[in-house]
Structures are given as structure tokens and as C-alpha cells.
Amino acid sequence: MPVMKGLLAPQNTFLDTIATRFDGTHSNFLLANAQGPRGFPIVYCSDGFCELTGYGRTEVMQKTCSCRFLYGPETSEPALQRLQKALEGHQEHRAEICFYRKDGSAFWCLLDMMPIKNELGEVVLFLFSFKDISQSGGPGLGSPGIHGDNNNHENSLGRRGASSRLRSTRRQNRTVLHRLTGHFGRRDQGSVKANSNVFEPKPSVPEYKVASVGGSRCLLLHYSIPKAVWDGLILLATFYVAVTVPYNVCFAGDDDTPITSRHTLVSDIAVEMLFILDIILNFRTTYVSQSGQVVSAPRSIGLHYLATWFFVDLIAALPFDLLYVFNITVTSLVHLLKTVRLLRLLRLLQKLERYSQCSAVVLTLLMSVFALLAHWMACVWYVIGRREMEANDPLLWDIGWLHELGKRLEEPYVNGSAGGPSRRSAYIAALYFTLSSLTSVGFGNVCANTDAEKIFSICTMLIGALMHAVVFGNVTAIIQRMYSRRSLYHSRMKDLKDFIRVHRLPRPLKQRMLEYFQTTWAVNSGIDANELLRDFPDELRADIAMHLNREILQLPLFGAASRGCLRALSLHIKTSFCAPGEFLLRRGDALQAHYYVCSGSLEVLRDNTVLAILGKGDLIGADIPELGQEPGAGAGCVLKTSADVKALTYCGLQQLSSRGLAEVLRLYPEYVAAFRAGLPRDLTFNLRQGSENNGLGRFSRSPRLSQARSDTLGSSSDKTLPSITETEGGMEPGAGSKPRRPLLLPNLSPARPRGSLVSLLGEELPPFSALVSSPSLSPTPSPALAGRGSSPSLHGPPRGSAAWKPPQLLTPPLGTFGPPDLSPRIVDGIEDSSNTAEAPTFRFSKRPEPTRTRSQAPLSGPRLSRELATEAAEEVKEKVCRLNQEISRLNQEVSQLSRELRQVMGLLQARLGPPSHPPDSTWLPDLPCPHQRPPCISPHMSGPPPGLQNTTLAVVHCPASVGTVEIGATPSELRSSMVPPFPSEPDPLGPSPVPEASPLTPSLLKHSFQSGSDTFH
């Protein structure tokens, strides 16, 4: 993988700086929001403060920074007032206050409050530093009133004795020592030196802003363009050293010419100057630490360079050639020290990492390495020939390869050392031999004759075979095996760049994508843990996941969980990464996981106001809003975030998905209660909307509320219909005192059987089937309704008695109902599918409903939310559908009833005999019908005819074969329109006997049976 640029995004390292600076006695601190809407809430608290006070971080967060939870009986009220005044004025404040821990124990605390500003100069945070001074001679816990700052002590000196003065002096001395502690150098072990500003005010704390990378102009960024140009120049110099140093050591050392006259002397000195300058620049060049941070501190840079490459670069930069220039005599072994410069080739490999993704560069590098190896071996081959000549007698020994070369070139050696071929010819011949030996078996024109030469030739052939196989044979396969991860990185990076180019993404978004990819790859090296562990058994995968996620599993929240539960949870935890400035969550987003901060810091924002600052070890998420609902279980439990979560630095996070948590809780129900109780305690900040006021996120849909709401909605749509009742005694029409009964449906009246007509139409409607099911045709009272006083008796006094009165028609006024309410569609029960929700409801009742004006209608729209209105409409539609089904079943029962009535009328006619009136008359005496069906009023009748006082008119309209009964028409009005049921033949039974107790006014009972339409008169 190419060399990392490092984590270059601008970071807000305020939290890390505060934690680093306030170490030791100043590790107890709080951060409060200075722009908060509700009394400067605490947005961060250190672990030292939690240990000092005994409160947990969750208990402290979002409380006011005045720390009222630490107050007690001996806490000075004037000191608290001065603290509040300093907060309101955004001023620095110092005081000694008696606070109380969670267990109730008191302690004296030196409180420092300092405002923190941003880059615009605005006070955005308050920093509170707490120092326990109870053990260092602080004020006695039994002497309340000695609180506050030094001004308060000066005012109280006159009223107190010597002990008070002594304590005040101790406090002043302690303040001076406290300031001296911050100004004396801690790392100076030899001598302690105080700064010149010992008694000056303390230096200001860091600002809450984004820090820039590379604050000094004298620093050279390791990823800048000038640094890249310089690295290229050093690369060429390193190649030059790799070529010239072996050549000068092997060939120039045996030359009698002076070194000062060498052609490469100037270039050698220039390269040495470049190396010396490179050493100087390395002390001012930033580098990337192991954690991925860009280090720009000069001291850290120097220490890092001294510990890594300084000594190698120093030896390579020793000016050996300058010794020759000044005619300083050196031994021949000094020339060998120049070979140490070849160690810079290791730096060369490091520099070439960033260019390794280019195939042309890789090919050039491989060929250069092959040629460089041949060059080095040619130098060694020449040295072997020279040493063979020096070791043997020059007069008798002439079988070396240099002698053979001199003979062929007609430049033989004289006396073993003089003469011979030139240095140039010897180097070319040596390079030719090594290349032919490395690439093949050679041609024999330059061959090895001596034992040393043959041994070297053998080694050259072996190396050549290896290099030939590696470079020209299996180089691609070897590189793929060795650098498969790098190849994957390059392929993904290329795909990412192609994606950016094709979609023309803006430059800021492009930079964010590239940096996120590089940093995440640096963290996990491109290894997908889930893909890697997929083939492992579940037992081993769970153990590995528990080890990788051990930080989040060590929270007290999971302390009550069993090992099996922890293993299941660990399989649903994922590691994520967030760059500075990136939003982890935005307000209103669906919260799909709980996040644990492993490293870095984040801030919680709402309307650009800092609500909390999160650091390592914090848990962010949301509690479970309602009992019985697990996160992610259903659409009704979707949690929305109430604030934005933004990364201040590079953050490493571990996230536990809500869906995975719900699955684990279903597998381990015994842990649900402990998790629900422990989650609010361990959450550093609750992101659930509505968590501030503990309100319900959705409207309750309990059956009781739904029923009440349906009654409210139903009452507004009910329309009053006329009803028929039989008055008792002197009751006037419309003077009923009982409220009308609603229509009873099976699902709303569990006391009634589902198939009962009484349950469908109310108690006022008698059961018609009793007439047929009765063993005798004589009228008998219904036992089911005999004892009920609320409904009229089915069998009143005998018709001939004095107490008997004919039934009367009771109709409400015309203003009570309008024409739409009297539509036959409503009476017949045929509902319009397009207007089902607004269909009026009809009811059978004894008493008409009072007139309801439009202004008295219940207001459902303005008072109900959109969701409530939708639910109400669905419930109304469901009720209408059930009503249609019941009406259809009622039609079938009425049809069956009509057939039974025809049979009964036939039996009555056969038993009572023929009527006593003339044959052309269809009048029959009024017989008491014990099982008369209460009819419904016809929509075209608004009241009884004026001439009728003792009769009742009723017309029953029933859908699908329902009969009609007309009672109360005068003989003159009806004879013209009525047709006798059997006009062609007389009644075989004869006239019916008229009871003696019947009134003088005749009544009409017209019986007409029609088989096609099932209508009877």
C-alpha cells in the first residue's frame, strides 16, 4: 500500500488537549455549554470528577454547571451567588466551596472556572476544575462560612481570630503553590528553573476550534509537492550512488591516476551535499505516527528521525571525496566505507511504495534491479581477475580472463600488471559476461579458466537461473501472492476514482471519500472480518468476536448478561470509523444502532448548540421508550434522533445494531428487564426524541380509547329516524322519557348471542319466531321480556278491556331529520361504497333523539390529529362493513319470518272461520296480535290521518322479500284501492266472529300474499 498521508482532516483536539494539560491534580474537570438555553448544562465530565464525587457520568450529564447536586448544609450561599454571577458575565472565577459527595460526605474543593472561546472570540464553553483540598490543610469541615475567594477572606479577617487568619494565609500560599505547579518544568530532573512569569496570570486554555495541520512555516509536510520533488532528486542520487560506488571501489582503486583528476569527482561531491541537506530537512519534515496522526512537533520529529534513519543517512553522507580534494591520505579500506551508502536503497524502496501502483514503474524497477545486479557482479568479476594476476607469477601464469581479453584485443599485460586492456574495455567485457551468464549459459567468448573464476561463474549461473525464473517467469504470480492486499487496494482505489470521475462529484466530496477510504483501509488493512470469519464454526467466531469487542462488552450494562448472551451480542457488533467533521447521526434520522466510542471525541449538537461532548468510553443511543417493545421490533418502535452527532477528531466506534439487539433479547428474555433498567444509566446521552419530557411518541391505541373515540365520532354522524312505540295510558306521542338505545352489534354486546334478533335490533323488537315456536297459538307473554320494565309489554291488556288502547304512531318533528336521512337506501341497508365512512346510522328506539343543530356537532377535525382521524375513519368503515353483513343476515331472517307469518295467518283464518261482514267487504275485526312485529315508519308518512284516532299506520320496507302491513285506513279510502285476496270465491271459513268487547270502530286487516315479491298486507 502507498505511504499514508496520515489523518490530515482538520481536527478539534480540544478535549485531548484539556485532558493532557489537566493531568495529576487537575484531572477533575467539567465542561459546560455557555450557550445553552437552560442554565449552562454540563456537556462533559472527566473520570476524575466521577471518582471525586461518587456520581456517574450519566447522572452528571445535562445538569447545570453550578453543580447543585453537590450542595449541602455547609455550602456557602454567597459563594454560589458569586459563581452564578461570574457565569452570567462569562468571567473567570475562583473559590473554595464545601461540596458533598453522593454518599453524603463533605469535602472542601478549590474551584476554578474559566470561559473558553472559539475562533470568533465567542464564549462557547465553561471549564470547571475541581481540586480536593481537604487533605492539604483546607478549612475545617466544622467551620462553615469560610468559603469563597480571597476577597471574601479579606472581609472576614476582622471578625475572626488568629485561627481564621492562619487558614486564610494557608489558602493564599496554596494558591501561589498551585500556580507555581503549572509554571515549573516537570521534565527537568537536574535543576528546577522557574519561568519569568511565575506570578503572572495562568495561561489561557486552548480554544474550542478546529486545529490546522502544520502550524509552523519552517516545517516541510511529508505529502507536499516540494517534498515529492525532493524525494525524486534523492531517488536519482541514490541510483547514482548504487552505480558509482561499486565501480569506483573496484576499478578506480587500481588506477594510477590521481583521484582529483577523476571525472566523477564533482558529481560525487554534489551527491554528498544533497545527502547532508537531506539530513537537515528530515529534522523539519512531518511524519505519520503509528496511530495515523500527523506529527508536526519539532521535538517529536527530531526524536523520531534519530531513532530510525539518522545513522544510516549520516554514514552515507560522509564526505570521503572531500578528503581527496584536500590531499588527505587515507587507507584503501576507507574506500570500502562508501559501500555503506548502498543502505539508502532501503529508503529507495520506501519511496517507491507510492509509485508501485503504476505497472510501468514496476516494470522499470524490476529491470533496473536486474541490471544493477549485473553491474555489481561485473565489478566482482573484474576484481577476481585482478586478484588472480596479483597472486600468481606474472611470467608463468597467463590463463586468467583478463589475459585472454588482452590477447584478443592485442593489448597484453607486461610483467603481470603493466599494459593490458583499458578499464573501459575490461568493464564492458565483465558486464557482458555477467549478463550472458544471468540470462543464459553464455557463449564462451569470455569464459572462466581458473578455479575462482569457475566458482564465480557457477554462482552467477545459479543467480541467473533464479533471477530469470523470478523476473521473466513467475514475476506476476509471485507479486500477486505477495501483494494481493496491495492489488486489492489499488483496484478499489481505481474503482473509486473512476466512480468519482464518471459522476463528476465535487472536490470536497471527493476528498472526503478518498480520505475515508484510505483511513479505514489503514485501520483494518482492507480485511473484512465478517467475510474472513464466515467459514469458522459459531463457537470460534463468537470467541473471536468477544475478544475484538471486549471494550463495549465490559460496560455495566452487560454485567447481568450470561456468557451465551454476550456471545450472541458480540456477533452483532461492528467496528466503524468516523473522520473529523463527519456527522455520525443527524437530527430526525432513524436510530438503528447504539454506538460506543473507542477513541476520539464527538460533539452532540442541536440548532448549532453543543449539548454534550463525548469521549472514549461513552455510550450513545436511546433507551427503550415503552415496556414490551424492543429496538427494531416493528414499525411502531422506530426511534428518531433528537440531535446531531458530529466527530471532532478521528473516531473509532463500535456499534450494536438495534435489529441484532432485538434478536438477542428475544433469545434471552430473562435479560430484557436488566437491559431496560441499565440502559438509561449507562447512556451518556439519550438521543431519543421525546426523552426530555418522557412523552409518548405515538397515540395510544388501547381498546378503551378506541371505543371512546369511536363513540364520539359515531355520535356526530348519527341521524335521528322516526320510531314507533305503543303508548301506555295517557302518554302523548313524543313524550317518552327513556333515552333511545343504540343499535346493538354482536361485537359490542357480548351478553347477546350473535344470531339473536334482539341483539341486532334492540330489546324493543319482539322475537317473531315465538309465534311459530309456541306450542299453542294462544297469546302468551314472553318470559324473556316479562320482567323488564324498560321495554313495553309484548302482551298488554286484553283488547276488549277498558285499559286497552290501540297503538299510536309517534313521529318526531319534521326538523329533526332531513330528506337525506329518510332515503330508502338507509332503511334498506344498502350502503354506497364510495361514501361508506359518512353514511348515517339508523337505530331502533322508543324515543326520538333530540334535534341536534350543526353547531352542536362534535368537533373531531380540529381536535384530533391526522393519525387519529385516519384510525377513526378505518374503524367507522369496519363498523359499516359489519353492519352491512348483519343487515344481509337480517334480510334472510325477515324473509323466513314472512313465510312463517303467511302460514300463521292461514292457520288463523282456518280456525276463526269466515268473516261476518258482507262478502264484498274485506274488513275483519281487530284481533289482538300477541306477536305483532314493531314496524318502521314509512318515509312518505309524517303522521296519522286526521280522521283516525284509534288506529296506527305503519309501513315496513324490508329489502329482499319483506312484507308490508297497513293498518288504520278508513273503509272509504281503502275499498277503492284494495283488491280482495280471493275475489273469485268466498271465504271457506266464513265470517270471523266479532268479540263482544271490541270497539265499535272497525279496523282493517288486509292480508295479501304475493309469492313473487314476498309481500303481505
Swiss-Prot record:
Residues 980-996 have a biased composition (Pro residues). The potassium channel is probably composed of a homo- or heterotetrameric complex of pore-forming alpha subunits that can associate with modulating beta subunits. A motif (Selectivity filter) lies at residues 440-445. Residues 771-786, 806-820 have a biased composition (Low complexity). Residues 1-232, 284-305, 356-364, 476-1017 are cytoplasmic. Residues 14-90 form the PAS domain. CDD domains: CAP_ED (cd00038), PAS (cd00130). The gene is Kcnh4. Highly expressed in adult testis, and in adult and embryonic brain. In adult brain found in piriform cortex, olfactory tubercle, cerebral cortex, hippocampus pyramidial cells and dentate gyrus and basal ganglia of caudate/putamen and accumbens nucleus. Detected at intermediate levels in lung, spinal cord, and pituitary. It comes from Rattus norvegicus (Rat). It is a multi-pass membrane protein. It is found in: Membrane. Residues 873-907 form a coiled coil. This is Voltage-gated delayed rectifier potassium channel KCNH4. It comes from the Eukaryota. Keywords: Coiled coil, Glycoprotein, Ion channel, Ion transport, Membrane, Potassium, Potassium channel, Potassium transport, Transmembrane, Transmembrane helix, Transport, Voltage-gated channel. Glycans are attached at N415. The chain crosses the membrane at residues 233-253, 263-283, 306-326, 335-355, 365-385, 455-475. Residues 254-262, 327-334, 386-427, 449-454 are extracellular. One of its GO terms (biological process) is regulation of membrane potential. Residues 703-726, 1008-1017 have a biased composition (Polar residues). Belongs to the potassium channel family. H (Eag) (TC 1.A.1.20) subfamily. Kv12.3/KCNH4 sub-subfamily.
